[in-house]
Amino acid sequence: MAAEGAAVRDETGRTYAAAAVALPSLQMSALHLAVAMAASSGAATLEAAALVSDGPGPNADDLAAVRDLGPAAVVFHAAPDGTLLATLRA
């Protein structure tokens, strides 16, 4: 699995950051974990999400997780050097 980090911003401006988890019994993408952290903290909606990865951009499941809390959220995908690779709609 490619190393990755993600962050999401909720409607109040709070930011939740996460890194991918790859344990034998638990695997979660950075974007999934950031959305889960926002949801468990009581966020009502998401305004934006960002994924930094040396691998491919967010997959359909990542985008669906963002869409669950932020149907209009913009998702940015960047390389580790900060180069913006894609701007997507959840």
Would you name each region that the model predicts?
Residues 23-37:
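A short, polar/charged loop-to-alpha-helix boundary motif
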Residues 41-90:
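C-terminal binding/interaction regions
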Residues 1-4:
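Short, small/polar residue-rich loop motifs at catalytic or cofactor-binding pockets
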